[in-house]
Regions:
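Bacterial N-terminal signal peptides that target proteins for export
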Residues: 1-4
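Disulfide-bonded cysteine motifs in exported proteins
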Residues: 11, 39-42
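C-terminal motif of bacterial Sec signal peptides marking the signal peptidase cleavage site
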Residues: 13-15
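Electrostatic cytochrome c docking/interface patches
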Residues: 17-40
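Cys/His-rich metal-chelating microdomains
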Residues: 19, 50-51
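Extracytoplasmic electron-transfer domains, predominantly the class I c-type cytochrome c fold
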Residues: 30, 37, 55-121
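Short cysteine clusters
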Residues: 44-47
């Protein structure tokens, strides 16, 4: 009986993200190429280690490698495109007093940054 339950659980988890599904960033209007440029412009790498971004080797914030595989954003929000954009635009509103500064990103800029982060697997 335990093996049956374990098998069904693994099938349910495996079915959560269908093979061949479009990357998350394609579904919400972000562009990872623009996101990469925005990450550089906003100097996100001063605080974060970000794969693929030159000189992004900061140690203040968490490293952002494999971001697409995380279950939460900043440990407090579900890792969905909408929640990530919200966090990128207003981190102090989400968690007042945290180390992430308000970025001043527009909605489109935040979508682009999110699109780049979702390429990190």
């Amino acid at each position: 009986m335990i093996w049956l339950a374990a098998g069904l659980s693994s099938l349910a988890v495996a079915g959560c993200v269908p093979r061949g599904a479009a990357p998350a960033w394609k579904n919400f209007g972000g562009d990872p190429t623009r996101g990469s440029a925005e990450i550089t412009r906003a100097q996100c790498g001063a605080c974060h280690e970000i794969p693929g971004i030159q000189d992004a080797n900061g140690l203040v914030g968490p490293p952002l490698g494999r971001f697409a595989l995380r279950t939460t954003v900043a440990g407090v929000l579900p890792n969905t495109p909408g929640e990530l954009v919200h966090w990128l635009r207003a981190p102090q509103q989400v968690t007042p007093g945290n180390a992430m500064p308000d970025t001043g990103l527009s909605d489109q800029q935040a979508r682009d940054v999110a699109a780049y982060l979702y390429t990190l697997r």
